[in-house]
Amino acid sequence: MTDSEPTSAATRSAPVSVLLPTVRWTDACDEVADQLRGPEAFGGADNAGAGEGAGDDAGSGDDGDGADPAADELLVICDSPDDPVAERRGDLPERVRLRVAGEPEGCSGKANAIAAGMEAAANDRVAWTDDDFHHPPDWLAALDADYEPRGPTTEVPVFVGLDPLARFFEPAYAIGGTLAVSVGGIAWGGAVIFERDDLRDGEAAFRRDLRRTVSDDGTLTEHLDVTAADRTRDVRAGGSFRGSLERFVRFLTITRYHAPLATAFNVLLGVSMAALCLLAPVAGVALVTALAGAVYARFGIDRATFLLAAPGALLAPPLMAYALARRTFVWGGRRYRWRSLFDVSVEPV
């Protein structure tokens, strides 16, 4: 599928700090860096302090002083000075800075990176993104333009499987992920924009919560009222059987702690759909396949994997039972033991 048509934005009303956690320099870094605008786009004059590589982190985790608050910026956030992306220090594109977040303690590496990025960001308007999808040339302009009429705005993810198990999960992710983000007031950390004052309990409380939990976008949803743009992004998912299984466990655990009632509903729905497919196979398979097909059509997902919805429904109860029984999961090279919303320990893999 292709991304939905973005909103055109000839001018930008406020400079944006884009936070991109990654341990490697990827195409996404270049894509976003190419979209940054200097002070001249906001009525100011360019200055030498915001030149190429200005303000990049020196490896201590502290900010450089070259950030220009009257311009867009990209903060590339890694865990350690030893991460491959840190080799770009001193050779960064214009208005790009490197931030070293440090090893996470009592939270996920992603949440820790976002908290560090929020501290380091020079602007009040902040966008989060990830490195696992393509950012077209007007990605940032469209997201920024959406903020003016909507306030905090998120785009909508479509998870595209890279291995057989990930492709098997696609119908479930379309219904429980794509559709849920679109209509449920859920922030997707891959493409969301907001201002610091939009955080209901203030930024300090938000950063404190990030540093004691796992899910960055789940935590943002707890602190922010957000609406979804009618625009999707294809997100690469999986690549190995084990990685896709760990992702499924992580996703279900996130909803378990951030939306327990929704999780209970999903479990009951999964059991009901499986029972229907077993007891009335013709009607059950037709209903489940039609539901998945309707969601695919709504979001322009041009993939045949909606036909896997019925087999997925049959396997949903044992898969959910497995995920709920798991006490740990692996994400980004770390094992997390997530006991409750704000009780997380990080263990070696």
Where are these regions (language model features)?
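Short, well-formed alpha-helical segments that are part of the catalytic scaffolds
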Residues: 2-7, 22-49, 63-69, 84-87
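Cell-envelope/extracellular polymer assembly enzymes that use nucleotide-activated donors
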Residues: 14-19, 73
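Short alpha-helix within the catalytic core of nucleotide-sugar-dependent glycosyltransferases
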Residues: 33, 123, 136-145
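Short beta-strand/loop segment that forms part of the nucleotide-sugar
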Residues: 43-47, 70-83, 97-102
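Long helical/loop segments within the catalytic core of UDP-sugar-dependent glycosyltransferases
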Residues: 93, 99-116, 139-208, 309-318
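Short beta-strand-to-loop acidic/aromatic patch adjacent to the donor-nucleotide binding site
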Residues: 114, 123-134
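Catalytic donor/gating beta->alpha subdomain of glycosyltransferases that bind UDP-sugars
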Residues: 159-162, 168-169, 205-262
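Membrane-embedded multi-pass helical conduit in multi-pass membrane proteins
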Residues: 263-337
